[in-house]
């Protein structure tokens, strides 16, 4: 038996309301139970270290033999604070279309950033694309900028695919998608 416990409805922030709820329904059909515990949980163990249960802060207890935690990603950029490199409020590195970091005290192109830590300009705002395909594309952009200077901008394709619970997702556009998704093949039922 698998139980997913989250502080908010899982997948909705990533996939949007429609696809997030569709995935949760498919998970439920495959025997996965989902619990929302906004105040968090406490993992309780035996003296031996063996997990006994997980208890929500509102008092609900869930028996458990194994606990796997996945708490998302946070930038490890504390060491950049005060360096002049521009960071957003959460600590992500702000870059331009050539993967060059913004900031003060250094020339454009002296500091570059790629991958999950970089905040990219897209459609008039800065966004993260924490996906392996984007990390590879940004690494190539960094290499081009280092070798040739800022000649070719990096424009990621806002696309990804995955499979979960028998559903194949191919998503193009900003994530989470705003509004209802357009179904090109198949249906949402």
Predicted segments with their positions:
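Well-ordered beta-strand scaffold positions
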Residues: 59-60, 167
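Rossmann-like dinucleotide-binding cores of NAD(P)H-dependent redox enzymes
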Residues: 1-42, 131-132, 156-164
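Short coil/loop linkers at secondary-structure junctions
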Residues: 33, 86-88, 150
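FAD-site-proximal beta/loop scaffold in flavoenzymes
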Residues: 46-55, 61-137, 141
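Mid-to-C-terminal Rossmann-like scaffold of FAD/NAD(P)H-dependent oxidoreductases
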Residues: 117-189
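Flexible, glycine-rich phosphate/dinucleotide-binding loops
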Residues: 10-13, 43, 77, 102, ...
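Structural motif
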Residues: 56-57, 164
